[in-house]
From Swiss-Prot:
EC number(s) from the headed UniProt entry: 2.7.11.26, 2.7.11.1
Regulation: Activated by phosphorylation at Tyr-216. In response to insulin, inhibited by phosphorylation at Ser-9 by PKB/AKT1 and RPS6KA3; phosphorylation at this site causes a conformational change, preventing access of substrates to the active site. Inhibited by IL22 treatment which also triggers phosphorylation at Ser-9, promoting inactivation. Inhibited by lithium.
Subcellular location field: Cytoplasm; Nucleus; Cell membrane
GO biological process: canonical Wnt signaling pathway; cell differentiation; cellular response to amyloid-beta; cellular response to interleukin-3; cellular response to retinoic acid; circadian rhythm; epithelial to mesenchymal transition; ER overload response
Reaction(s) this enzyme catalyzes, per UniProt: L-seryl-[tau protein] + ATP = O-phospho-L-seryl-[tau protein] + ADP + H(+); L-threonyl-[tau protein] + ATP = O-phospho-L-threonyl-[tau protein] + ADP + H(+); L-seryl-[protein] + ATP = O-phospho-L-seryl-[protein] + ADP + H(+); L-threonyl-[protein] + ATP = O-phospho-L-threonyl-[protein] + ADP + H(+)
Xref: InterPro entries: GSK-3, Kinase-like_dom_sf, Prot_kinase_dom, Protein_kinase_ATP_BS, Ser/Thr_kinase_AS, STKc_GSK3
Active site: D181
Keywords: ADP-ribosylation, Alzheimer disease, ATP-binding, Biological rhythms, Carbohydrate metabolism, Cell membrane, Cytoplasm, Developmental protein, Diabetes mellitus, Differentiation, Glycogen metabolism, Kinase, Lipoprotein, Membrane, Neurogenesis, Nucleotide-binding, Nucleus, Palmitate, Phosphoprotein, Serine/threonine-protein kinase, Signal transduction inhibitor, Transferase, Wnt signaling pathway
Miscellaneous comment text of the record: Higher expression and activity of GSK3B are found in the skeletal muscle (vastus lateralis) of patients with type 2 diabetes. Several potent GSK3 (GSK3A and GSK3B) inhibitors have been identified and characterized in preclinical models for treatments of type 2 diabetes.
Gene3D superfamilies: Phosphorylase Kinase, domain 1 (3.30.200.20), Transferase(Phosphotransferase) domain 1 (1.10.510.10)
Modified residues (Phosphotyrosine): Y216
Name this polypeptide is given: Glycogen synthase kinase-3 beta
Length: 420
C-alpha cells in the first residue's frame, strides 16, 4: 500500500441503495472432509439480476488494506479458485466499484463473477463482497523477483504485459471510465500463460467533462504531473502517464519517478523531462502558470535507460510521459506502436514454448476510439483466422444477444473481408 488516503468508491450522486432481499442469507456447513463450506445467495456479475446459491470453501486471507480484506476461496461446484474482495458498504450510496465492474467484460480485466452482501460485527454494518477471478501473480512481484536477482525482465515479457495493459485501458476508456490507480501491484499475471488482467477498480470513475474530480488520486510514483499540480478537470490520460511509469520501471528495474511527496516526484519528473513550459503548465493546471520553477534542460531519453534498451521501447516511453495530457498517446495508439510489432509476428512464442495469449480479438467497442488502427492492430494471420471462424448466419443470429462477447471477432472479421 502507498499510504495515501483511500478515495471512496461510492458514487456521490446516487440515490440510497436498497438492501437486497437476499441480504445476509449466509449458511456455514461442513463437507465430508470436515472443511468449512460457506453458502451465500449471490448475484451474477454480468447479465440479469438472478440471485443464486454459491458455495465456497478453503477461505484464507491473501490481502488487506484501507479498502477492506481480500480472501482466496474455492468454488465448490467447479473447484475454481476465486478472490473475494470484502469492503464496507455505505448503505446511503451505490458502490461505484460494483457499478463499474458490472459493465466490464474483457480478457485483460479481472472478471466479476458474483457479488453478495453480508453483515458485520457491529449493528447495521453491511459489507459488499465481490467474487472475482483469482490470478496468482502480479507484475510487481515478478519485476521485484528479477530486480533482486540483479536481472532485467526479458523484453518479450515487457511487451506482453504492457500491450495487454494498454488493451485493458483502451477498453475502459471507451466507456469513459478512468482507472485512476494504475501501478504494478494492480496488474495480475498468470505466469504460465502470460495473461495480464487489470484489477482493483476501487478508485475508478466515469469521468464527465466539466465535472470536477479529486486530484489526490493514484499511488505515488505513478501520479501524472497534472495531479501533482492539483488539477480537478483531468482526463483518462492520467492512466496513460501511469502506464508509461510502469513501462519505464520494467525497463529500469526500479521506479522512474520515486518520491515521498508531490514536490519530490515533480523534481524527479523535471530531472528527466526538463522544466515544463508555461504552455505545458497551462495544459496541466492553469492556476499554476505564474509559479516559478528552476530552469532545467530535459535529459536525453537514451541516457535515462540502460545502453541495451530497445530504441522502440524508449520511443514509446517518450510518447507516454509527456507533460501535456493531450500529447500522450491513447492506449489504442500505444498498442499499435512499433515496440509491439514482435507480438504481431505469427511465429512468436512465449519463452516457455507456449503460444502467446489472445492479443488480437479486438471488439468494436475497443476499436471505437480509432477504428482505422485495426489495419495495424489485427495482423494478416489473425484476420485469416477470424474469417475462418466467422459464424454462419444462423449461428450469428443465435449469438445476437451475447453482448460484448458476441462482438469479439467482429472487428477482425470485418478487416478480413475488406482485405480479401
Amino acid at each position: 500500500m502507498s499510504g495515501r488516503p483511500r478515495t471512496t468508491s461510492f458514487a456521490e450522486s446516487c440515490k440510497p441503495v436498497q438492501q437486497p432481499s437476499a441480504f445476509g442469507s449466509m449458511k456455514v456447513s461442513r463437507d465430508k472432509d470436515g472443511s468449512k463450506v460457506t453458502t451465500v445467495v449471490a448475484t451474477p456479475g454480468q447479465g440479469p439480476d438472478r440471485p443464486q446459491e454459491v458455495s465456497y470453501t478453503d477461505t484464507k486471507v491473501i490481502g488487506n488494506g484501507s479498502f477492506g480484506v481480500v480472501y482466496q476461496a474455492k468454488l465448490c461446484d467447479s473447484g475454481e479458485l476465486v478472490a473475494i474482495k470484502k469492503v464496507l458498504q455505505d448503505k446511503r450510496f451505490k458502490n461505484r466499484e460494483l457499478q463499474i465492474m458490472r459493465k466490464l467484460d474483457h480478457c485483460n480485466i479481472v472478471r466479476l463473477r458474483y457479488f453478495f452482501y453480508s453483515s458485520g460485527e457491529k449493528k447495521d454494518e453491511v459489507y459488499l463482497n465481490l467474487v472475482l477471478d483469482y490470478v496468482p501473480e502480479t507484475v510487481y512481484r515478478v519485476a521485484r523477483h528479477y530486480s533482486r536477482a540483479k536481472q532485467t525482465l526479458p523484453v518479450i515479457y515487457v511487451k506482453l504485459y504492457m500491450y495487454q495493459l494498454f488493451r485493458s485501458l483502451a477498453y475502459i476508456h471507451s466507456f469513459g471510465i478512468c482507472h485512476r490507480d494504475i501501478k504494478p501491484q494492480n496488474l495480475l499475471l498468470d505466469p504460465d500463460t502470460a495473461v495480464l488482467k487489470l484489477c482493483d477498480f476501487g478508485s475508478a470513475k466515469q469521468l464527465v467533462r466539466g465535472e470536477p474530480n479529486v486530484s489526490y488520486i493514484c499511488s505515488r510514483y505513478y501520479r501524472a504531473p497534472e495531479l501533482i499540480f492539483g488539477a480537478t478537470d483531468y482526463t483518462s490520460s492520467i492512466d496513460v502517464w501511469s502506464a508509461g511509469c510502469v513501462l519505464a520501471e520494467l525497463l529500469l528495474g526500479q521506479p522512474i519517478f520515486p518520491g515521498d511527496s508531490g514536490v519530490d516526484q515533480l523534481v524527479e519528473i523535471i530531472k528527466v523531462l526538463g522544466t515544463p513550459t508555461r504552455e505545458q503548465i497551462r495544459e496541466m493546471n492553469p492556476n499554476y502558470t505564474e509559479f516559478k520553477f528552476p530552469q532545467i534542460k530535459a535529459h536525453p531519453w537514451t541516457k535515462v535507460f540502460r545502453p541495451r534498451t530497445p530504441p522502440e521501447a524508449i520511443a514509446l516511453c517518450s510518447r507516454l510521459l509527456e507533460y501535456t495530457p493531450t500529447a500522450r498517446l491513447t492506449p489504442l495508439e500505444a498498442c499499435a506502436h512499433s515496440f509491439f510489432d514482435e507480438l504481431r509476428d505469427p511465429n512468436v512464442k512465449l519463452p516457455n514454448g507456449r503460444d502467446t495469449p489472445a492479443l488480437f480479438n479486438f471488439t468494436t467497442q475497443e476499436l471505437s476510439s480509432n477504428p482505422p488502427l485495426a489495419t495495424i492492430l489485427i495482423p494478416p494471420h489473425a484476420r485469416i483466422q477470424a474469417a475462418a471462424s466467422t459464424p454462419t448466419n444462423a449461428t450469428a443470429a443465435s449469438d445476437a444477444n451475447t453482448g460484448d462477447r458476441g462482438q469479439t471477432n467482429n472487428a477482425a472479421s470485418a478487416s478480413a473481408s475488406n482485405s480479401t
